[in-house]
Curated annotation (Swiss-Prot):
This is Chaperonin GroEL. Residues 536-546 have a biased composition (Gly residues). It holds the Pfam family Cpn60_TCP1. Its main location: cytoplasm. Together with its co-chaperonin GroES, plays an essential role in assisting protein folding. The GroEL-GroES system forms a nano-cage that allows encapsulation of the non-native substrate proteins and provides a physical environment optimized to promote and accelerate protein folding. GO terms for biological process: protein refolding. Residues 527-546 are annotated as: Disordered. GO terms for cellular component: cytoplasm. It is found in: Cytoplasm. Forms a cylinder of 14 subunits composed of two heptameric rings stacked back-to-back. Interacts with the co-chaperonin GroES. The gene is groEL. The lineage of its organism: Bacteria, Pseudomonadati, Pseudomonadota, Alphaproteobacteria, Acetobacterales. The keyword Nucleotide-binding applies.
């Protein structure tokens, strides 16, 4: 086992603070509308330019092991905030740095770190209550667009697009962000349930120009196993032909004789039919087939449930207003499932999302939820160069998360104002002892840090701006860094999602509290590499002393 270095007390905290400062100073230049860019070197290709705090934090790795521990703890603040709220990473970093700095001074002055932490926690709880109390619900599309615009660093086109996407797919719908292949940024909305399986054979196409199959008011057979022979389902096919309606078969696969028979019938015009493979794999496939069955009001034909193909009747099949199939995707529009059944299924999936600990599973469950509850919207981000597209995509991602957060918990005045105003609530707070009071004062000073940093990045004096804002008793009054003016921020559309501000403060206080109460640090001692061995001496070669 490699030897370890151990640092104690002030020395440990001092090194950790250096790491915190290096990371925070690189991240905080991006804060606010006048925030600067940070250029990140890539091992191959062009460097990446970003104003996204968490992207900067993730790139920083320091040579000194102890400094690096401090930087990594601060990086954890940014990524945790990003995971929960999707935005506010720079605010969280600025808050954490301010709390750690002040806390470090207090511990150096001989105060009890545990009491400091208790004071910090008490003050944070009061501030969070204050934020919740003053949060204003987002109701109109215009308000939604404003939140998106602020998070996209003032680009109103992005805000509008996110607002439109949320209107179309609802708050449960999935909105994904992709890179476009051209200059324009565009929004694509898929209504109904879409899954990534196309027709099994091109002979099922009904529109040869577009190479798509469109079925109006079809029956839908949802079969779990492979179909190799149609013999067991002949009675069902006859019933479908007599009804005069098309049939869509969703099965694990359709091959051999079954596929040939279906194609021949389709070409002769006796049967309007199409077949697609079931989406997903393994257990996820079963769940998705069940989703389709609930959406279309049908049943999954599965031997596990004791249902055989021979016994299937028309009322076991699902129906929908329209099914659109192309080479890669199938879309079921307006399924005939009962609203209560769909609601029940949505509730069940939501419960699974709450329980799961895997990010991948959560993402897949959310996709299923969206397909049942709303729809899927895709924002394709364009730009003139690859670097620009990547930078804009970062901003669209941030804006999307911020907008979702605003719909969940409402909005507060932006520009760091809501946190700065919360300091007024901490003035008369009662603490058990003086050390705890100092902990509360640390939070009181730290809450002004984001407002001061936004002003500083805009070329103003942060302390002067903060005092001017707090002198005015109007809750929505603050500093518009973009225009360099004081105004009613909510009316001007400068707003932050309450969830983002709350999460940033909670995560910053949590990690900063841990750093303040650290008394020892252990890191691996770097091994000294042995000097490369020299060649043998050149003895015996006399006469070379000129």
């Amino acid at each position: 086992m490699a030897a370890k270095d151990v640092k104690f007390g002030a020395d440990a905290r001092q090194r950790m603070l250096r790491g915190v400062d290096i990371l925070a100073d690189a991240v905080k230049v991006t804060l606010g509308p006048k925030g600067r860019n940070v250029v990140l070197d890539k091992s191959f290709g062009a460097p990446r330019i970003t104003k996204d705090g968490v992207s900067v934090a993730k790139e920083i790795e320091l040579a000194d092991k102890f400094e690096n521990m401090g930087a990594q703890m601060l990086r954890e603040v940014a990524s945790k905030t990003n995971d929960i709220a999707g935005d506010g990473t720079t605010t969280a970093t600025v808050l954490a740095q301010a709390i750690v700095r002040e806390g470090h001074k207090a511990v150096a002055a001989g105060m009890n770190p545990m009491d400091l932490k208790r004071g910090i926690d008490k003050a944070v709880a009061v501030v969070i209550e204050e934020l919740k109390k003053n949060a204003k619900k987002v109701t109109t599309p215009a308000e939604t667009a404003q939140v998106g615009t602020i998070s996209a660093n003032g680009e109103s086109e992005i805000g509008q697009m996110i607002s439109e996407a949320m209107q179309k797919v609802g708050s449960e719908g999935v909105i994904t962000v992709e890179e476009a292949k051209h200059f324009q940024t565009e929004l694509d909305v898929v209504e109904g349930m879409q899954f990534d399986r196309g027709y099994i054979s091109p002979y099922f196409v009904t529109n040869p120009e577009k190479m798509t199959a469109d079925l109006e008011n079809p029956y839908i057979l949802i079969h779990e196993k492979k179909l190799s022979s149609l013999q067991p389902m002949l009675p069902l096919l006859e019933s479908v032909v007599q009804s005069g309606r098309p049939l869509l078969i969703i099965a694990e696969d359709v091959d051999g004789e079954a596929l040939a028979t279906l194609v021949v019938n389709k070409l002769r015009g006796g049967l309007k039919i199409a077949a697609v493979k079931a989406p997903g794999f393994g257990d996820r496939r079963k769940a998705m087939l069940e989703d389709i069955a609930i959406l279309t009001g049908g049943q999954v034909i599965s031997e596990d449930l004791g249902i055989k193909l021979e016994t299937v009747t028309l009322n076991m099949l699902g129906t929908a207003k329209k099914v659109h199939i192309d080479k890669e995707n199938t879309t079921i529009v307006d399924g005939a499932g009962k609203a209560d059944d769909i609601k029940g299924r949505v509730k069940q999936i939501r419960a699974q999302i709450e329980e799961t600990s895997s990010d991948y599973d959560r993402e897949k469950l959310q996709e299923r939820l969206a397909k049942l509850a709303g729809g899927v919207a895709v924002i394709r981000v364009g730009g003139s160069t690859e670097v620009e597209v990547k930078e804009r995509k970062d901003r669209v991602d941030d804006a999307l998360h911020a907008t979702r957060a605003a719909v969940e918990e409402g909005i507060v005045p932006g520009g760091g104002t809501a946190l700065a105003r919360a300091t007024l609530k901490l003035e008369g707070l009662h603490y058990h002892n003086d050390d705890q009071r100092v902990g509360g004062d640390i939070i009181r000073r730290a809450l002004q840090a984001p407002l001061r940093q936004i002003a500083h990045n805009a070329g103003e004096d942060g302390a002067v701006i903060a005092n001017k804002v707090l002198e005015n008793s109007d809750y929505n009054f603050g500093f518009d860094a973009q225009a360099g003016e004081y105004k009613n921020l909510v009316e001007a559309g400068i707003i932050d999602p309450a969830k983002v501000v709350r999460t940033a403060l909670q995560d910053a206080a949590s990690v900063a509290g841990l750093l303040i109460t650290t008394e020892a640090m252990v890191a691996e001692r770097p091994e000294k590499k042995a000097a490369p061995a020299g060649g043998p001496d050149m003895g015996g070669m006399g006469g070379m002393d000129f």
